[in-house]
């Protein structure tokens, strides 16, 4: 099990943030990046050849930029939700919906006037792409996420204004991309994997709702709903290689969950989000033995 004191320090640090959700999100993002950088062993990758879709034109301080939105059946699809459900999710929590995509390397090209420009290939799941073709909302959402992803990955500042290229599905040539081949299954709910301690009375601590998902192939994130709590005071958390145990103050909550993945407990971090009344846990995963 991980050292409860170490995790308790993380809870206290987030507690001081209070209701400032923006700073909390920044803290969680920073923790996630640190965890991903700590992983030195990466799963093997496989090459895919994305298929052309459509091309948009924008610019940066360096000049013209083209983004080729491509697709491949090898890219995992996002969660299957309606546009109404998606809109509600985005209004409640902008980080609650994820569209898996592969961001390709920049490649130099020449535009129609023979002037130099830069192009990027962004690939999404093929079935999702076909659905996106019939939805302006999904298309604009994908373009926004792709643009922000390229900005983060390559330290760019792209103009949010863009124009779709007519009669030109891509700029230049679409290169092969490497994606991780050892994709672990996306985990949404682990309620049926929950294993309560034997002999616990029905009137005992409540089992909180647990939601987990893979933020990256080597990073597992968890949200534990704790509506009866206003802060992290009295919370205890222990993490083993494949187990998460949480206790609440005054025995309000108790969670003992088996997780069928190998967790790096020493690098795990936790924070309590006061506004959402959730315990957020970021857990890097140990490499799968070859």
Swiss-Prot record:
Expressed at low levels in normal mammary epithelial cells (at protein level). Highest expression in lung, leukocyte and placenta. Expressed at lower levels in brain, prostate, colon, heart, small intestine, liver, ovary, pancreas, skeletal muscle, spleen, testis and thymus. The modification Phosphoserine is found at residues 12, 173. The keyword Lipid biosynthesis does not apply. Changing residue 163 to A: Reduces binding to TELO2. Keywords: Nucleus, Phosphoprotein, Transcription, Transcription regulation. The N-terminal region is required for binding to phosphorylated substrates while the C-terminal region binds to the other R2TP complex components. Belongs to the PIH1 family. This is PIH1 domain-containing protein 1. It comes from Homo sapiens (Human). The gene is PIH1D1.
């Amino acid at each position: 099990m991980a050292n409860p004191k170490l995790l308790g320090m993380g809870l206290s640090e987030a507690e001081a943030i209070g209701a400032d959700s923006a700073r909390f999100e920044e803290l969680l993002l920073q923790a996630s990046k640190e965890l991903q950088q700590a992983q030195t062993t990466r799963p093997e990758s496989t090459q895919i050849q994305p298929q052309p879709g459509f091309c948009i034109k924008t610019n940066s301080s360096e000049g013209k930029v083209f983004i080729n939105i491509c697709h491949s059946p090898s890219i995992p699809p996002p969660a299957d939700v309606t546009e109404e459900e998606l809109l509600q999710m985005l209004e409640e929590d902008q980080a609650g919906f994820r569209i898996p995509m592969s961001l390709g390397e920049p490649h130099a090209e020449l535009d129609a006037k023979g002037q130099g420009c830069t192009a990027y290939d962004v690939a999404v799941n093929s079935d999702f792409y076909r659905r996106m073709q019939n939805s302006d909302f999904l298309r604009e959402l994908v373009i926004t996420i792709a643009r922000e992803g390229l900005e983060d990955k390559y330290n760019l500042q792209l103009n949010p204004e863009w124009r779709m290229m007519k009669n030109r599905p891509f700029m230049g040539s679409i290169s092969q991309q490497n994606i991780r081949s050892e994709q672990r299954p996306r985990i949404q709910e682990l309620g049926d994997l929950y294993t309560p301690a034997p002999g616990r009375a029905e009137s005992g601590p409540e089992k909180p709702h647990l939601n987990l998902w893979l933020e990256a192939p080597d990073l597992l994130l968890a949200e534990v709903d704790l509506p009866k709590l206003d802060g992290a005071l009295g919370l205890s958390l222990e993490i083993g290689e494949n187990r998460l145990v949480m206790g609440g103050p005054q025995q309000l909550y108790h969670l003992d969950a088996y997780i069928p993945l190998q967790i790096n407990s020493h690098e795990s971090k936790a924070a309590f989000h006061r506004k959402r009344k959730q315990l957020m846990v970021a857990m890097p995963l140990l490499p799968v033995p070859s």
